[in-house]
Amino acid sequence: MPKYYCEYCDIYLTHSSPVGRRQHNQGRKHISAKIEYFQNLLREEGITPQNFLGFLGSQAYNNILSNPMMNNFMHGNYNGYMKYNPMRNYHHSNRNPNYQHSVGMHNNKYSRAGYVPPGANKYPNNNFHNNKRISNTPKPYNNYTNKPITNSPYKNDKQDYRNNNENSNNFSNYQMNKDNSNFVNKNSEQPN
């Protein structure tokens, strides 16, 4: 098996396994050699920190920000282990289209935890955490008497109050009427 050559350090690795390569790539000599390589490359191109963004142009900068993986690097979330453990510092983007990302809000007085700007609702409506019923279907039991809720005071006691579907109520009424009629017919027959 051929030995692994590192072009930044200009050496052949004695351990060319993936573990040996990883250890070499995380070493301080390799990192400093890589930094020096790219600094020399930028120096040869005539790129200085003052004209760096002008050299990239607005299109290149916008393309970097449109890539969600590059956003991790731009926000200072770069991790040296990203290549080998990509989910370690990955922050999921908010999928809410009305969400406004607060870039540079750390110096703003509105960014303090618990601070509510003037005129804002201190207790916003939240359907998940409040106790209001969202659906219009009635509760199966009354809160005060703990008895089943009825739509009419003349309903049969055998009706299933848990199912408020009109079709099933009609069917259950039909079944009860049928059972009651059979019961009456059986009792009306008297032996001679």
Curated annotation (Swiss-Prot):
Belongs to the U1 small nuclear ribonucleoprotein C family. One of its GO terms (cellular component) is U2-type prespliceosome. PROSITE patterns: ZF_MATRIN. Pfam families: zf-U1. SMART domains: ZnF_U1 (SM00451). It is found in: Nucleus. HAMAP family: U1_C. This is U1 small nuclear ribonucleoprotein C. It comes from Plasmodium chabaudi chabaudi. U1 snRNP is composed of the 7 core Sm proteins B/B', D1, D2, D3, E, F and G that assemble in a heptameric protein ring on the Sm site of the small nuclear RNA to form the core snRNP, and at least 3 U1 snRNP-specific proteins U1-70K, U1-A and U1-C. U1-C interacts with U1 snRNA and the 5' splice-site region of the pre-mRNA. Its main location: nucleus. Residues 133-154, 174-192 have a biased composition (Polar residues). GO terms for biological process: mRNA 5'-splice site recognition; spliceosomal snRNP assembly. A zinc finger (Matrin-type) spans 4-36. InterPro entries: Matrin/U1-C_Znf_C2H2, Matrin/U1-like-C_Znf_C2H2, U1-CZ_Znf_C2H2, U1_snRNP-C, Znf_C2H2_sf. GO terms for molecular function: mRNA binding; pre-mRNA 5'-splice site binding; U1 snRNA binding; zinc ion binding. The keyword Transferase does not apply. The keyword Nucleus applies. Keywords: Metal-binding, Nucleus, Ribonucleoprotein, RNA-binding, Zinc, Zinc-finger. Component of the spliceosomal U1 snRNP, which is essential for recognition of the pre-mRNA 5' splice-site and the subsequent assembly of the spliceosome. U1-C is directly involved in initial 5' splice-site recognition for both constitutive and regulated alternative splicing. The interaction with the 5' splice-site seems to precede base-pairing between the pre-mRNA and the U1 snRNA. Stimulates commitment or early (E) complex formation by stabilizing the base pairing of the 5' end of the U1 snRNA and the 5' splice-site region. Residues 164-173 have a biased composition (Low complexity).
